[in-house]
């Protein structure tokens, strides 16, 4: 998943969607995700404390210098609740932190920032380029020294071996890959995930990218993506992943497998496939 040189990012980076948390009539997708965020949280627990419903926040491009703040947020609101991390009791993992920030140079990841300058939501995205026929796929797990995280990367490598999104969309050369969508639990229910996703759609339209790809290891994440108009293009049960003859991942219900979701934001034409 390498970066293709795209049009000047300076214009993109200067654009902000200035909005008030309570004014969810600006975007239909924000109204939808407000309902979804009310119903679903990663942990399933309510927000720890109430927040000001009228607090202003902006949607901004994540900058390289935001890395530390992004990781701090993910440690609090994402890493500990991700099903595979939880099952393996992953704990502190510098390799995971580095891996999470890897797509930032693609200049298509966005953050929600409150009036105090705090990051209250992120959508980390990367760019996927169609591989050349003679390309040898790199295995992310080969260079990982953390034994538990290596298991997760090995699973991701296996999924890439079994499924190629470019086979589904034979006319596409570049696809946006949604990596991590996370919202501060104290600000859920305010449509932030919808605003982050809408900004990603705008990026796609600005750069002629037609397809949005998201890999979900969480049942809840897959349901949210469905509500956002994504559809399933690949599925693999955790019970079917047996690299050494034994099942590696047995996360708690309802997390039963990997789902790859896709959405056509532009005029993409999908090939006829069977799940």
Curated annotation (Swiss-Prot):
Q: Where found?
A: Cytoplasm; Nucleus
Do the record's keywords include Iron-sulfur? no
Recount the entry's temperature dependence annotation: Optimum temperature is 37 degrees Celsius. Retains 84% of activity when incubated at 4 degrees Celsius for 3 days.
Site (Regulates binding affinity for coenzyme A (CoASH)): residue numbering on this chain: 188
Q: What is this protein called?
A: Arylalkylamine N-acetyltransferase 1
Instruction: State the organism named in the record.
Output: Drosophila melanogaster (Fruit fly)
Q: Identify which top EC class this enzyme belongs to.
A: transferase
UniProtKB keywords: Acyltransferase, Cytoplasm, Melatonin biosynthesis, Nucleus, Transferase
What changing residue 99 to A does, per the record, is: Reduces catalytic activity
């Amino acid at each position: 998943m390498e970066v293709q040189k795209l049009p000047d990012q300076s214009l993109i980076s200067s654009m902000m969607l200035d909005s008030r948390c309570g004014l969810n009539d600006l975007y239909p997708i924000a109204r939808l995700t407000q309902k979804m965020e009310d119903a679903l949280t990663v942990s399933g627990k309510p927000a720890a404390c109430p927040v000001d419903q009228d607090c202003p926040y902006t949607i901004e491009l994540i900058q390289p210098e935001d890395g530390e703040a992004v990781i701090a947020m993910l440690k609090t609101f994402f890493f500990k609740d991700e099903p595979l991390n939880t099952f393996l009791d992953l704990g502190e993992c510098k390799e995971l932190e580095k891996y999470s920030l890897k797509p930032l140079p693609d200049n298509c990841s966005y953050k929600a920032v409150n009036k105090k300058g705090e990051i209250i939501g992120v959508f980390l995205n990367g760019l996927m380029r169609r591989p050349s026929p003679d390309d040898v796929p790199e295995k992310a797990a080969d260079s990982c020294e953390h034994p538990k995280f290596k298991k997760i990367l090995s699973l991701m490598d296996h999924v890439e071996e079994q499924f190629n999104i470019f086979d589904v969309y034979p006319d596409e050369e570049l696809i946006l890959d949604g990596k991590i969508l996370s919202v501060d639990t104290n600000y859920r229910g305010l449509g932030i995930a919808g605003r982050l996703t809408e900004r990603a759609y705008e990026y796609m339209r600005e750069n002629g990218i037609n397809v949005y790809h998201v890999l979900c290891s969480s049942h809840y994440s897959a349901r949210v993506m469905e509500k956002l108009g994504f559809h399933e293009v690949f599925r693999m049960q955790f019970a079917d992943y047996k690299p050494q003859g034994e099942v590696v991942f047995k996360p708690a219900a309802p997390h039963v497998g990997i789902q790859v979701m896709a959405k056509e934001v532009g005029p993409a034409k999908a090939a006829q496939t069977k799940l």
